[in-house]
C-alpha cells in the first residue's frame, strides 16, 4: 500500500453499534426532527435534507404505526412524504425547554383526554420564529411536490409548525406527566374539539377576532425613520375556507384519500391544502358537496362529502403555515437550493482560494403575522463550505499521526457537519465504519444487491476514485414513512463525496483569515438591503413565482417596510467622584481608567504564578499594574512572586495549593500561562473556584507580550481584578426604589448528557452595583423548584442583610426562552418562583418578568438620505413588528461597528408592578450599561450577561457548582 496513504482497513477504536439496516445517503428523503411548534427553534444542521428527491425504500421496516390526522400531516398530499422521527401519536411528548432548561414542550397532550379532532392547533399555541407568535420558517427540510407533477396541489405538514434558530438535542427518554398539579416545565393540554362523527353535525363558524387593545408604545426619545428586513404582504383573497372531508365507506390509507380528492380538481380547483381530513381552499364551494370516486384496488364506489366548517380571515394564524409552504415553492422556482432550513445559490458561490473555502449566498425566509399585519421576514444567510472533502482531511491526519490514525480521525470527525454536493444535504457524522468500503454492497428496496460504487455511478454518474476508503455513519432518529412504517437504520456516506462545513478551528485562530471571511459575510446595511432588493426583483420578474403567490392572493411590496422608531436618551454614568453623559458611541473607557471607581478593594495579599521563561513579561505586567492602579483609586502591594520550573498542569496545581496552604490571607491568584491552554485554564479554575475558593485571574502571555498594547491590557486586567475582589466600577441612575434585578440563563453541557446548568445572578443593593450569584445543575426532566428556591430565597436574605429591608419590586430577565415557551413561563414557571416569597411573612413584592431573545433575524436600518446605515445605539421599536399576543419591544442598545443592526427582543410575560412601556424600555437600556467587563453598552442587560458567564464557566469548565464563599463576587468574569 502507498506509504503516504492511510491504511483504512482495521478495527475502529470506537466500535460502531451494529444496526440491522443500512441506508444510503440518497435512499430516503430525510425529514427533519418533528418540531413542536411551541419549541420555536430550528433543527440542527446535522441531518439529511432533501429537496425533490425520489424515495428509495429501506432495507428493513418496522410495524406500521397509526398516524394522527391534523396539521402535522398536511404536507402529505399526492404521495408527498411527511415522516417524523417518532410515531405520530398524540401521547408522545415532544422535547422542549422550560424556563430553566429541558422540560416538556407547550404542545403537551395528556392521555386522559378524549381523542383529538383532525384540525389545526390553537393559533395561540402555534408559536414560531424568533419573536412573533405566528411566524413559521419556510426554509425547512420538507419536500414540495415530490411524487406529483401537479405543483398546484399544496400539501401541508410539520414544516408548517414554527421554527426559529436552533433546536436543542432532545433528551434520550421521554416521561409521561402525572395527573397531579402541573410542575415546572409541564404545560397544559391543548384545547381541542372532539373527533367529528356522523351523529354530531358540523357547525359553520366564521373566524373574526377582536384585537385586544394592549398598550405597548412608549414616547420617550427622539423619533427616527427606520427600515426593516420585513416586506409587507397584501392579501387579495376575501377569505380562506376550511372544509371537513368524509369518505364513506371509510378510506384508511391517506395516499388513497389524496388521490381521490385529486380526481375532483375540476370541482375543488387546483389550489388546495389537504391533510386527509381537513381541506383548505381559497374559493368558496357549496355548504355541503357530495362527490363520487372509485377505489382502484377493488373498484368500490366511495362517497366523498365536503362540508364547509370555517371561514378564515386571509391573515389568520391558521393560514400562516401553508403560506410558508407556498413561499418555499417560490424559492424553488427561483432555482434556490434548500440546504438545512435555508435556501442558497451555489452558482453564485464566493471562493476564498487562499483559505480553500466556498461561501454560498442565500436567504432565510418566513412569513409571520404581527401587530402590523402579514410580513415576509427575509434575512441574508451564508453557508461556509470547505473545498476539502473528508477524505482529504483523513489523508492530512495520516501524515501527521500514522500510529494513532483511526483514533485521531474518529475524534476529529465525529460531531462535524458535512454536505454531500450531489444532493445538497447536510449530515452530522456520528461514527466511522472502518470495516466497510465502497466495494461493499447493500440491499435496495426492491431486494436487489448493489455496491456503493455501482449506486453512485448509476444514480449520480459519479466515479469513486478511492475504493478502499472507510464509510462515515450518520444515525438519524427513528421516524415514519408515508404509510406509517417505522424507519430505522444508518446512513452511510463516502468521505470522498462528503465535504466539511463550517470554519476550521485552525482558521478561527488566524486573524487575517477571519478578517477575509468577515468581509464576505458581515454585510453593511446598504449591502444587506441590496441583497433583499435582489430577491424581491427576482420574484417579481419570475412569472411562475408571482403566479404561485397569487394563487393564494398574496402580493409582496416592492421594497422593505419602513417605520418610525425612537432613540432613547443617553444615560449618565456615575463614578466615585464624577458623573458624565455618555457619547453617541457609548464608550467610556477613558473615563473609567482616568477617574476612581465607585468602590475599590485594596490588593495587599496576592500571588503571581508564572513559568520561568515568562519572567520578563511578569515583571513588566506588575510594573504596569502599579502605574495604573493610582488613577482608578486602587491600592496594591507587590505580589508574592512564585516562579514555576515548567508549565505542566501538575506544576501549577501543586504550587498554587501549597501557596494557599502556607499563606492563609491570599486575596487573589494571578497566573500567567504560555499560550491558549484550555486544559491548564480549566485546572486552575477548578482549583480556585471549587476546591480552594479564591478569586483568580489567568493571563495569556501573548496578550501582555506586546509593549504597545500592555497599558490597555493591564487596565482591563486590573478592572477585572477589582470586580472579582468585590469592587464596584460604575453605576447609572435607577429611579425605581427598593428594586432587585435578577438575570437567569441556561447552559447545556454536551459532555455530561446535555444536563442544564442554570446561572442565577441577583442585585443585592439599591444602586444595582453589588451582585449575588448561584448555580443550579439539572439533569434532563429533573424538577429544580427546590434548587431555585434556594437561589431566590438566598438572594432575598442577602438583600435584607445589606439594606435591612426586602425589595418592593423584582425584575427578572430570563434568557434563552423561545416563543413557544412563553405561555409555559407565564402560566406555570413564574407561579413556582412566586411561591418562594412564602418563605417570608406577609411578603408579596411586585414582579416583572422579561424574556430576552437574542437569536432573532430582525434587522434594523437607519434610513439616511441616500441609503441605509447602521442605527444609533438606543434605538427602540415597539409597534408594527411586535407580537399580537404580548407586550414586547425591540432594543438596539449596543454600538454596531460591523454588519447590520440586530436588536434584542424583549417580551414582558408578567407585570404586576404596572411598569409603563417607557419604564420597561428605559430600565432595560440602563442595565445594558452595567456590564463591568466592557466600558460601554452590550446587547443584553448586565444581569443576563453575568448569568450567561456564570453558567458557561460552571457547565463548560468547572462541571461543578462553585464554592459558596465566592457567591458575592463576580469571580466568573
Curated annotation (Swiss-Prot):
Keywords: Biological rhythms, Cytoplasm, Developmental protein, Differentiation, Endonuclease, Hydrolase, Meiosis, Metal-binding, Methylation, Nuclease, Oogenesis, RNA-binding, RNA-mediated gene silencing, Spermatogenesis, Translation regulation. Arginine methylation by PRMT5 is required for the interaction with Tudor domain-containing protein TDRD1 and subsequent localization to the meiotic nuage, also named P granule. GO terms for cellular component: chromatoid body; cytoplasm; dense body; nucleus; P granule; perinucleolar chromocenter; PET complex; pi-body. Expressed in adult testis and in most tumors. It is found in: Cytoplasm. The active site is at residues 745, 783, 815, 948. Pfam families: ArgoL1, PAZ, Piwi, Piwi_N. Its main location: cytoplasm. Residues 668-959 form the Piwi domain. Residues 28-65, 162-199 are annotated as: Disordered. PROSITE patterns: PAZ, PIWI. Belongs to the argonaute family. Piwi subfamily. Endoribonuclease that plays a central role during spermatogenesis by repressing transposable elements and preventing their mobilization, which is essential for the germline integrity. Plays an essential role in meiotic differentiation of spermatocytes, germ cell differentiation and in self-renewal of spermatogonial stem cells. Acts via the piRNA metabolic process, which mediates the repression of transposable elements during meiosis by forming complexes composed of piRNAs and Piwi proteins and govern the methylation and subsequent repression of transposons. This is Piwi-like protein 2. It comes from Homo sapiens (Human). The lineage of its organism: Eukaryota, Metazoa, Chordata, Craniata, Vertebrata.
